[in-house]
Amino acid sequence: MISYRKLAMRVLGHSPVSAARTARRSTAKRAAALALTAALVVGMTLPAFAQDWYIEDGDISISAGETGNKVTQGSTTKENDTDTVIKSKDSSTASSNTVTINADEGKTVNVTLDNVTINVDEGYEHGYDPNAYKTAVSVTGSGNTNIELNGNNTLTSGYGHAGLEHNKTDGSGTLTIQDEKNDDGSAKGSASDTTGSLTATGGYHSAGIGGSDKQDGQVTITGGEITATGGNGAAGIGGGAGDKYAAVGGDGDVTISGGTITATGGSLAAGIGGGAYGNGTVTVTDGDITAKATGMYGAGIGGGFGAIPKDTLIGGNGTVTISGGTITEASGGYMAAGIGSGYQGLGTVTIEGDAVIKNAQGGEAGAGIGSGTYGDSEIIIRGDAVIENAESSANGAGIGSGQGDLYPDGDGMVIDLTVGNVTIEGNAKIENAKSGSGGSGIGGGAVGIGNVIIRGNAQIGNATGGDEGAGIGGGVLGTGDVTIEGNVTIENAQGGAGAAGIGGGAETQPDTEDTRNKVSIKSTEAGSPNITAKGGGVLNGGGVLDENAPLAGAAAIGSGSVADGATEVKSDITVEGKVTIDATSGGNVAIGDSTNGETRFSGLQVGTTITRRNAKGDDVSQPGDVVREPEKPAQPTVTPTERAEAPSNGSVEVERPVTVEGLYVANVLGKQITHTCTQNGTTLTIRANGIVASAHLTLGMVRTLKAQGVKTLVFTTLLSRSTTVSVDALLAAEPDAPDETAVVWTHTGPRAALTIGGADHSALLK
């Protein structure tokens, strides 16, 4: 150790010499030197150095100082510690000492755990009062705490305390767990990078990382290898067990932007999110995550067990946003979703960006992605997100809602339907969505309604309903309201026995005359849908309402079947634009319902192909299902068929019949009907003998007409319905489109529409 004298001499610029060669100084000189040394020592601020703190040496308390941390261990206190590192002398032997971190408002504490092992679990030695037990590492205060991981760290807490505890209150700050540096302190970015790890285990009713008993928890993870296990009733990462009567605690607020995470919740709790009677708010932007609930009622990622002790739901809700990273597995407990809500909660799930969900597995009666039993769901899947597998073991939707409620009441049954609202858009891809039984692949769980929108460039591989559940739409006893728009591909929408491929579940009966299954399929500027749907086959007994009553096979698109003598819900099905549909019935009707039979479509665009087959393989296609391209003339021309005498002074235009090669007019069934064309000066008029009719041209025809001097087109149908369009305006609408681009001009009673290449340009009509 350098003496004060030597330090003073160095400061003065002198090199000390040994006492053997120093002449004896007078007392006065020695006094002067001592006075100078004392003055220097008192006036200097010694630099703060990093220090390692060993947990075996006692409990450690850390708080934020002015330029670093204030660290206290036993009788030792150090101010302004700029690099606080906590270690174990022997990480193979757990210490029973603890770490307490407190960050005041507006300040940040940075701490490194370096191969620390703490175990303060004493079982139930002190009874059932959490205050009698210890916490391995506790984070408090209104400021922020960052914990860096080096090596392998293990934290195990006692009864009522989280392994790494951070209780969320109105005034609390944030806890961030990170692995920003290598174990030697160097920056990441090489092949020799090391990964710090943390294994945290909570005591009874306490999270592995997050909230303690009857407390909410807040956790942010940016990196590292994290393994967290919650105690009974608590999340692996998130909330401790709440109190359903006091309505306190249990909520989990978790953000993950990196790392490899394995989280296991205790019974009634989520793997990541809410504890028992708690809600889960989880945001994932990156990382590789495996999250599992054990026992009952908690989601893999999302809400814990929701209860209604006093007519008000306490907990259960799951709000999950995943915009990146990989969910390797998210498994919910019995009656809970894989990703979404726990028992009775609302599942609000957004999956977007480049997120990948490899496997989302709902427990029995819970959805793979969506809600638990008796809960509704609001789901958006968009961007470039990929869902490889979303599945319910039974009665929940693969993607959608959990099971609804059905119970006897007097001579009847009370049906309390859940609702699965699902939107799939952008470039999202669903490879497999499946229900084990009763629920839909995408939409409603058993005893659930499915409201589904699929649009943009979305791709659906397999959407498979369980017995009596639609592939896309309603679960058993539930209607389906499905909208499919744009460049959507559905490779296989397979209904379970008695249920539609797309539409309603089996045994769905109307509450009112207005109760309908609704399916809308149409092309947009994004492109045309390509759909393959198959209705479920016969169910020989085992139905929900009457287990002895068999059910007939169902439509590929439309309604599920009902028992003999029951009233089947009708279907409203609309198809617009250009579509490709391959529909195979499980019974007799491919597209429609048993009451009205096959639904017919009219006015579809050129290129449309609808194929219909019944369960026997017979073709049951309808007129208008196939709309072929008209033969393109080599050179469309306008030729007078009867010339009128020219006026003597040339001042009067005469209307004359003409023929436009390649132009045809079709009726509502897609069949060609008689039409005439006349020209008066620069105006060409097309007349059709029908109230509902479509004139079919191509842009090549219109360009030729312009070259021949035609400036205005008129389309006239019965009841004196006429609309006009400027040739220049029509060509300017799609100036770069090729000659073969279809132009379809439709009159439907008093309404008129104009499409060019499938795009709506009705605004051009006058």
What are these regions (language model features)?
Residues 1-25:
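N-terminal secretory signal peptides that target proteins for export/translocation
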Residues 2-3, 9, 30, 34, ...:
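A composition-driven surface/loop motif
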Residues 21-28, 41-49:
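C-terminal segment of classical bacterial N-terminal signal peptides
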Residues 85-87, 108-114, 119-121, 128-133, ...:
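Long, contiguous ectodomains of secretory-pathway proteins
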